[in-house]
Amino acid sequence: MTLRLKSALATLFVLLFSLGTAPALQADTRDFPTDLIGLNFSGAGFAPQVLPGKPGTNYFFPEASHYRRWSAKGIRVIRFPIIWERLQPQLGKDLDPTYVKLIDQTLDNAKRYRMNVVLDLHNYMRYRGQIIGSQAVSYQAYADVLRRIAQRWHGHPALVAYDIMNEPHDAVEQWPIAAQHGIDAVRSVDRARPILVEGNGWSSSYLWPRYNAKLLELKDPADNLIFSAHVYFDNDGGGKYLKKDLTAFDPDVGIRRLEPFITWLKQHGKRGHIGEFGVPDNDPRWLAAMDRLLARLRKECIPAMYWAAGPNWGDYPLAIEPVNGKPRPQWAVLQKYVKPSDCETLGPR
C-alpha cells in the first residue's frame, strides 16, 4: 500500500469517525467485579410463551426502588435476563424499540445506584423453540442479535459483561459453534468487557466436564472469557426443590455439585463464575447447604449470582425479595458474604 493511499484512508477514517459512521470498537479491558454475591434481577423474561407480551402485564422490569434497596444492602452486581424474541421479534431485523427503551432504563437505574449489569440472553440456545444452528435459526442470526446488543449498549457505563446464552441444552455439537459466533459478534464491537460462556447441559456445574470439552477451543481476541455455571441442590439440579429432595439430605450437596466445575477450571487454567444458585425458604437445611457452598466459593474467589430478585415473584420459594417489608430467610445467609472481597482477580485460586 502506498504512502499516499495510506494517508487518504486515514483521512477517510477520521471523517467517518467524526460523522459517527465508523464502527465503534472499545478496547480498554474491563475486569469482572470480584464481589462474591450478586443477584439475578428477573421479570423481563417472564412468560416467554406469550410473545411479544405486554410490559407490566406479562413481563416486568424492576422499578428504580429495587435498585435503590439492593444497592443499600451492598449488592453491586446484577445479572439481567432478557428474551431474544422480545428484543428482536424478527431474526436479522431491528431491535424492538419498547424493549430496548426498558433495557436502557434498567442500565440507567443501575448506574444511578452504582451497580454493574450483566446482560443475559435468556434463551436456552433457542429462538421460538428452534435450536441455533438449525435451518430456522442460523448461527449468523444468533451473531446478529449479539452484535446489535453490543452496538446498542457497549457505551453504557453500567454494563459490565455479556452472558451470551443462558443454559444451553441438548446442543453438544451446536453450542461451541454458536458460542464462537457469539464471541466474534460481540468482539466486532466491544473488546473491553468480559464475555460469560455458559455450558451445555443447562450449565450444570456438576455435569460441566461431561458436556463442555469443546468450549476449551473457543477463541477470544480480547482474551477475556469467563465460564459460568449454575448450581442447584435438589436431586435433578433443576431448582424445583420437591419434598423428596430432602431424603438422605447432605449439607455438602452444594459443594459436591460445584467440585466438577472447579476441578475443570483448575485443570485448564480458566476463570469461573456462578450465574445462578438458589434455595427455597421452607426448610433451614437448604440454608445451611447454601452457607457451605458460599464459604467454598469465597475461598476460591468465584462470584455467584443468587436466583432471584425482582418484581412479581409472588410466593416463589427461591425469591429473595422482602415480603411485607420482612427479609426472606435466604438473606440472613447471603448478607454474611456481601462485603468487600480480598480477591484481586476471579478464581479459582
Question: PLM features: residue spans?
Answer:
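Bacterial N-terminal signal peptides
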Residues: 10-20
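An active-site-proximal structural segment forming one wall of the substrate-binding cleft
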Residues: 58-76, 92-123, 130-161, 174-187
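Bacterial N-terminal signal peptides that target proteins for export
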Residues: 1-12
